[in-house]
UniProtKB/Swiss-Prot annotation:
The keyword Metal-binding does not apply. Keywords: Repeat, Stress response. Sequence repeats lie at residues 26-36, 37-47, 48-58, 59-69, 70-80, 81-87, 88-98, 99-109, 121-131, 132-142, 143-153. Induction: By abscisic acid (ABA) and dehydration. It comes from Triticum aestivum (Wheat). This is Late embryogenesis abundant protein, group 3.
């Protein structure tokens, strides 16, 4: 009985020992595995950290390079824009100068043309005025000469008409006077003859042509 118990204890002890050994092995293996895992994890973490650090450095370097390139491009574009602005300003300045110069030249040409045209018009006006004045003077001279000629002709005609009229008037008056005298003498003679009277009768007449007074003496014989 005791022998069985001892054997059982022995077996239990072996089993326990084997279990403990196995457990120890397992634990050791687990510990080794855990250590390996931890080391691998540490190594992986280190590698990851290094990779991350390297990646960050690369990213930072790329960002710096990109920023530098961007800054350089911006600087270059700014310089190009500045040059373009300067060129545009210079072109505008030259264009403004050319426009002003052209306007100045056109104004000078217009002034010269205006002065020339004004001079020509003034000269033409002077010539026209001189021609008009000369024509008016000549016309006035012709009119004056014609008036003088007409006045001379009129005066001559009036003078001749006056002389002719005077001659005609004198002749008519003389004839009328003679007729009247003859009529008076005839009437006187008739009366004297009728009354048987006779005598001398003197009749005074005026010559209207010469203004002289004449006497007409008629002798009448009285019949006894």
């Amino acid at each position: 009985m005791a022998s069985n118990q001892n054997q059982a204890s022995y077996h239990a002890g072996e089993t326990k020992a084997r279990n403990e050994e196995k457990t120890g092995q397992v634990m050791g293996a687990t510990k080794d595995k855990a250590g390996q895992t931890t080391e691998a994890t540490k190594q992986k973490a280190g590698e990851t950290t290094e990779a991350t650090k390297q990646k960050a450095a690369e990213t930072t370097e790329a960002a710096k390079q990109k920023a530098s390139e961007t800054a350089e491009a911006t600087k270059q574009k700014a310089a190009e824009a500045k040059d373009k602005t300067a060129q545009t300003a210079q072109a505008a300045k030259e264009k403004t100068y050319e426009t002003a110069q052209s306007a100045k030249e056109r104004a000078a040409q217009g002034k010269d043309q205006t002065a020339s045209t004004l001079g020509e018009k003034t000269e033409a006006a002077k010539q026209k005025a001189a021609e008009t004045t000369e024509a008016a003077r000549q016309k006035a001279a012709e009119a004056t000469e014609a008036a003088k000629q007409k006045a001379s002709e009129t005066a001559q005609y009036t003078k001749e008409s006056a002389v002719t009229g005077k001659d005609k008037t004198g002749s008519v008056l003389q004839q009328a006077g003679e007729t009247v005298v003859n009529a008076v003498v005839g009437a006187k003679d008739a009366v004297a003859n009728t009354l048987g009277m006779g005598g001398d009768n003197t009749i005074t007449t005026k010559d209207n042509t010469t203004g002289a007074t004449t006497k007409d003496t008629t002798t009448t014989t009285r019949n006894h």
